[in-house]
Amino acid sequence: MTEHADNITERARKIRLLILDCDGVLTDGRIIMLPGGDETKAFDVKDGHAMVMAQRAGLRIAIISGRQSSVVRARAKELGVAHLFEMAWVKTEPYEKVLAEEELNDEAVCYVGDDVVDIPLLRRAGLAVAVADAVEETKEYSHIVTTRRGGRGAVREVIQLILKAQGKWDEAMSHDLG
């Protein structure tokens, strides 16, 4: 389901917390297993830069992942992500925890997901977003679907939407323009 643009803008204006799934949202969903059991993942630099811009503009960010990964921990630390939850197969528990810590309600949350495990949070979020290559069931529970795929700029697209709706995009960009 995709809502009218005015309704999306109104929802985006209320967002104070961006919660992201990891595999399939921050990455393309592929996990490359290396000899010895280590793994690697690829992150889009534009997504990361937008996350830094968003935080400078006052948007809080959390990542909730169903897996555990030193690569994700390192990336979250590098980007200054406030909340990282791993091994969260049931994502409602960390969702409730971060809302309590940030003293926010569902309306102030944008959640971005790609698979059926994300549906419970998409149902609750003030702005529910599925990435372009999300499974169809996930798209059905989203207010919008990005034009970009997970791990390929979808997060930047969402952040740009939120910051523009809040009138903060130009200011966020000005830091990098000098």
State the predicted function of each range.
Residues M1-L20, K168-G178:
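Non-catalytic pre-domain segments flanking phosphatase-related domains
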Residues T2, R16, R30-M53:
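Basic, amphipathic juxtamembrane/active-site segments
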Residues A12-I31, L122, V155:
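Asp-based phosphoryl-transfer active-site loop
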Residues K14-R16, L59, E107-A108:
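Short coil/turn segments at beta-strand junctions that form active-site/ligand-binding loops
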Residues T27-M33, R73-L79:
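Short, basic/glycine-rich phosphate-binding loops at helix/coil junctions
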Residues G37-K41, E78-L79, H83-F85, T92-G178:
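Mg2+-dependent phosphoryl-transfer enzymes with acidic/Ser/Thr/Gly-rich catalytic loops
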Residues M51-R75, F85-E86:
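Substrate-recognition element of Asp-dependent hydrolases with the DxDx(T/V) motif
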